[in-house]
């Protein structure tokens, strides 16, 4: 071995002995962080936006642009208050929230299920969007929970 090799080896060993915490610093906690929370009155806005985003992703991924446009046009008066609530909650981060939901939707897109969802929201009996969106998949798409008081 050359003198340079011995020097590098000695420095490496000395560094390892002197700072054992470096070896452990990269170990991450196995505890999963709690999902962020919102007020109970805000949750329907998140769920409805998750529904709208699911349909938007289906429009792009499943060739459902015509039905998505029909949905937005027929439900714009119902969508608007939820959009305002979302903007009030997230302020300048609304686009980041919607992008996160869209990414989650695109990873799990099922065009057959999306087709059924379009049939539901465009049906003649016109169910409330809040009711349609109050399902487990909506909260899985946005990742929020209702805050609990301690």
Model-predicted segments: where are they?
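Compositionally biased, proline/threonine/alanine/serine-rich low-complexity intrinsically disordered stretches
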Residues: 25-36, 138, 145-150
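Compact alpha-helical subdomains of small soluble proteins
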Residues: 76-150
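Bacterial N-terminal signal peptides
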Residues: 10-18
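Short N-proximal segments of mature Sec-exported proteins
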Residues: 36-100
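Bacterial N-terminal signal peptides that target proteins for export
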Residues: 1-9
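Sec/Tat signal peptide C-region and signal peptidase I cleavage site
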Residues: 19-25
